[in-house]
């Protein structure tokens, strides 16, 4: 019993954990006397990212996240994030459960971001735009068990698309109204957040613009992604599928689907393909080549991935059909973070 009580206290959610035996001496009842913390821990996380392409396409990001937990007796959380680099952004939100079981919740928040992005025509970078956005949102949703979440909400704000390096006659967007209805579903059974060896991750998003919320462009947008990983001894294999559609509507340039880069489509430059609908499929296998710490699950992996996909109604007017790529991968979980 004492070991179980120690395990419960180690969760970090209680100031004190005591127990007592009561009732019939022959068959006593175990009473746990818990005193919940009136405060919660604060988590701070930093991340550093660097991408260098063979054609001079580079990207650098320094990011930090702050999570303040249990700000009230319902388990409310304050979250803030800051990103610096080619993409610079700031986001702040309040996640507030509405009941003691923490199934129903609301989440208001603010988002502001600016990013320098290259525009490609048939594989060649011909312009660079500075995309910027700022909007607020309000979501409400429900958590299902330990793995699934469904939410819906509204957004309202503005979008910009300014020329940074481009011909003077290329179009620009200045403070265009942005707003609409959103829905999002997430299922997550991964054994860990990064480089997981077992589990399924599913994400699906839907957005429909609404003039009453400030939108100037009339369009719909749906996108989904699923990744399943399967352990193979100390190694693992995974399959990933993703796709998106505008349902025949014309997406504004700031909300086009984008693929290209080491994550979405290895072999393409970051953001090389932009369009109104797409699909991708990927199979990968990673072999453990070095173990750093079995206690913390830290190891180095090497392997490869094969990717196929197609982007339709591309911004450059080209229709290339299905394209393929192969990639060699070196990755891992290290004491300094993911590699």
Language-model segments: which ranges?
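Outer-membrane beta-barrel translocator/pore domains, especially the C-terminal barrels
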Residues: 190-199, 251
């Amino acid at each position: 019993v004492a070991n179980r009580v120690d395990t419960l206290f180690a969760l970090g959610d209680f100031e004190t954990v005591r127990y007592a035996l009561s009732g019939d001496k022959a068959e006593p009842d175990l009473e746990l006397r818990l005193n919940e913390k009136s405060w919660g821990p604060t988590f701070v996380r930093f991340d550093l990212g660097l991408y260098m392409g063979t054609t001079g396409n580079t990207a650098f990001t320094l990011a930090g996240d702050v999570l303040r937990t249990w700000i009230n007796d319902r388990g409310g959380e304050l979250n803030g994030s800051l990103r610096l680099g080619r993409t610079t952004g700031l986001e702040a939100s309040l996640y507030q459960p509405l009941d003691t079981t923490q199934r129903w919740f609301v989440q208001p928040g603010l988002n502001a971001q600016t990013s320098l992005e290259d525009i490609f025509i048939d594989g060649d970078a011909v312009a660079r735009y500075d995309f910027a956005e700022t909007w607020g949102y309000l979501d409400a949703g429900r958590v299902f068990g330990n793995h699934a979440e469904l939410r819906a909400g509204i957004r309202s704000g503005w979008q910009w698309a300014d020329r940074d390096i481009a011909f003077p006659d290329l179009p620009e967007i200045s403070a265009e109204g942005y707003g609409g209805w959103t829905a999002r579903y997430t299922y997550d059974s991964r054994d860990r957040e990064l480089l997981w060896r077992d589990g399924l991750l599913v994400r699906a998003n839907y957005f429909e613009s609404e003039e009453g919320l400030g939108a100037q462009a009339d369009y719909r947008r749906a996108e989904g992604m699923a990744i399943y990983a399967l352990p193979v001894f100390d190694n693992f294999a995974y399959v990933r599928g993703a796709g998106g559609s505008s349902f025949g509507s014309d997406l504004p340039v700031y909300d086009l689907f984008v693929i290209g880069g080491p994550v979405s489509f290895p072999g393409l430059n970051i953001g090389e393909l932009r369009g109104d609908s797409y699909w991708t499929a990927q199979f990968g296998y990673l072999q453990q080549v070095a173990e750093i710490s079995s206690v913390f699950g830290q190891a180095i992996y090497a392997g490869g991935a094969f990717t196929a996909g197609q982007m339709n109604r591309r911004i450059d007017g080209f229709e290339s059909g299905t394209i393929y790529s192969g990639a060699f991968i070196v990755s891992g979980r290290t004491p300094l973070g993911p590699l």
